[in-house]
Amino acid sequence: MKNQSVDAVDHLDRAVLAIGTDYADGQLLSWHHHRRAQLLYGVTGVMQVSAGAGAWVVPSGQAVWIPAGMAHQVRMLGVSTRSLYIEPASAPRPAAQCEVLAVSALLRELLLQAVEMPPEYDEQGRDGALVTLLLHEVARAPSLPLHIPLPRDDAALLALCERFLAAPRIDARPQAWARSLHVSERTLQRRFRQAIGLSFAQWRQRACLAQALAALAQGVPVTTVALDLGYDSPGAFSTMVRRVLGRPPSALAARQPVAGHNAPACL
């Protein structure tokens, strides 16, 4: 199925529904939720996902797992997707929060094949076997560190985090944050760990990586992205991206715009 709202087929007696969708660049899917769990795979572009526990950035070629019933919104930056909508009883991942997943070559091909299946596919035939293998591959997909958690119970720290996300820089120093909160640097680091589960440096890097992926998807040159984020050199920036994602920034740069039309507002 392609460019079809899941609401139109959600009633079908199938454990997994696969839908391919092309989105206009910059299209925002405002807050919504699905009865089924969702695996949202980006063939092209970058997806920016927001949910209760923070934000996730999903580079091209990777996917985000969204548990059943979780309210979320997604901004699409040059994105064509392949989604699986999975009955909660068949969900292959136990996560209670969103996760960005690394998509193997096998999982990618299975996703591309799945959207070619008819909605009421033969569960006892080839399509049923494909779905079974899909669920196994989703279950074993490794999680990537592309979640930007936000504090829930520390309003002052949350305000600083949100301000930083508007203009992240890798050269931001914890001493300045500590002064803003009128605490010692040691206390700041402890509050970060308690409220977010990451060190200041780890969270800062994730925020910068999220900004970088969005900028690269919009065609900003690698050198400009690196310098805007405060890296000493494009090489230092490229090293960080390779270490986290296993790919150079050039592999994440904007591709040809996706042909198509505006997709349904909630998918």
What is the predicted function of each stretch?
Residues A53-A68:
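Short acidic-glycine-tyrosine-enriched beta hairpin
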Residues G61, L188, F192, A236-F237, ...:
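Short hydrophobic/aromatic patch on the recognition helix
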Residues G69-C98:
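Ligand-binding loop in jelly-roll beta-barrel domains
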Residues A91-E162:
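Amphipathic alpha-helical segments enriched in hydrophobic/aromatic residues interleaved with Lys/Arg
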Residues R126, V131, L144-P174, A178-L181, ...:
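A short, Lys/Arg-enriched amphipathic alpha-helix from helix-turn-helix/homeodomain DNA-binding modules
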Residues Q175, Q194-P234, S238, A254-L267:
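Terminal helix-turn-helix DNA-binding modules in bacterial transcription factors
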